[in-house]
UniProtKB/Swiss-Prot annotation:
GO molecular function: FAD binding; oxidoreductase activity
Protein name: FAD-linked oxidoreductase ATEG_07660
Effect of a null allele: Does not affect the production of azasperpyranone A.
PANTHER family: BINDING OXIDOREDUCTASE, PUTATIVE (AFU_ORTHOLOGUE AFUA_1G17690)-RELATED, FAD-LINKED OXIDOREDUCTASE AFOF
Role, per record: FAD-linked oxidoreductase; part of the cluster B that mediates the biosynthesis of azasperpyranones, members of the azaphilone family that exhibit anti-cancer activities. Azasperpyranones are synthesized by 2 clusters, A and B. Cluster A is responsible for the production of the polyhydric phenol moiety while the azaphilonoid scaffold is produced by the cluster B. The non-reducing polyketide synthase ATEG_03629 produces 5-methyl orsellinic acid, which is then reduced to 5-methyl orsellinic aldehyde by the NRPS-like protein ATEG_03630.
Glycosylation sites: 276, 280, 316, 380
Broad class of enzyme this protein falls into: oxidoreductase
Organism field: Aspergillus terreus (strain NIH 2624 / FGSC A1156)
Amino acid sequence: MLRQLYQSLALVAAVHATGIFANGVDIESLFGPYLSPGTEIAEPTDADFSTVASPRWSEWKPPTWTGAIKPKTERDLQKIVRIAAAHNLPFMATNGGHGTSLIYGTVKGIDVNLENFNSVKIDIEKNTLTVGGGTKLGDITEPLYNAGKAIPRGNSPCVGVIGATIGGGIGFNTGLFGLGVDALVEVRLVTATGDIVTVSEKRHPDLLWAIRGAGANFGIITEATFRMSDQPNNGDAVIGSFVYPAEGALAVFEELQSLDYVLPADLGVQLSIAYNRTINASELTVDMKHFGPWDTFVPHWNTAERLKPIARTIKNVTLVELYAGLDGPCQSGVYVSGGTTGLGRTDPQTMKEVMDEMTAFYEAHPGFLGQTLFQRYANNNTLKTPLSTAVYPWRDTKNFWLHENIYTDPALEQPSIDLLLSLRKKLQATSGFDEPHIYVNYAFGDEGPAAWWGADNLPRLRRLKRRWDPKGLFGRGTPIF
């Protein structure tokens, strides 16, 4: 199944990529005369290509860029879309460069770097935050903190705000505020015709429904507006990190199971399985982010201590400090592939089997640097929002499993993929769900649209795709088909 999907997508990409580049037309001549001063254009052979193209987090199956454009204005984006469409030139708008779907490896086209669309505007009177298409999560942390406001958001500061949101938008504060898509109230969108439309609950509400979960498939979002909430605990938080040996992991997994129905909204928990090469043993780390006062964190600390950690770190921090410390995915230059499945229940024995399989893999492959994460965020507020408001379907997910294969030796590619698929199969079998719940931002790429957006949503989603993007210009990483 994986090989067939990959081959069919590669064929589609090859068909779209033929034509103008094969005829030797360069993008400077094609686009340059129509774009504003300050717009940068580069071919892959140009010395400045790496500064014009968006930097990419992972070396695994990257797109093949036939050129790069860094536009200055919204009008530039309109012209880029129109010219590219007229000449059958594939392109992709990029910001953080964090997508790791295997489908990206089939993409061949122009990188449209949104770096110049980095803007943050807070309107206290309207209680909204508006960001540009090139804004990263790290850019909004301090302005929101200073304003005493918050939005549901992803974690890592180098990830794009809009990209993280339009796939769903989960993070440590999901328990308090729900999903990012639920706070998204309006976008400005460059469509497949090069027109700009404002999309909101009053204007094109059907399209807003689709953007809330599958937004990359419908155009280039130049600006997005979010409804804000008041900042929790005056912008202060408590973070705790507890490390456990492999032999104590089952007890930790059983404790996580006890949180299936009682996780407090102000507590985000992440478990990570990794390998300590110094002592040659797997370790389980429990990271807690508590968006409340110290005294309400103490019971969670006591529980963590009862499980006998071998190391711990506990600190009072501001929200600015909390998010600045989540910069792990900001490192680049290595091969990273990822995969996921959503869990509706915690099965301690399966999680222990995952850790055992990871340990065996670490020992067999000393160059493997990857990790497996279990992200547990309360979903009470997520469930309060009706399913009908967004194409994002998996509100009943309690635990987001994210596996990251990380390595520098390309020879580890296939063994690490085999590991990912094996772990995914194990976890899916005891997830409590009959159908895979795939958080599209974490997708490996072989799961398909029904797993990303729900089979019941596909007829409506496909109709909207045919209406707004009939030639399939957008959404090349996780396409609607």
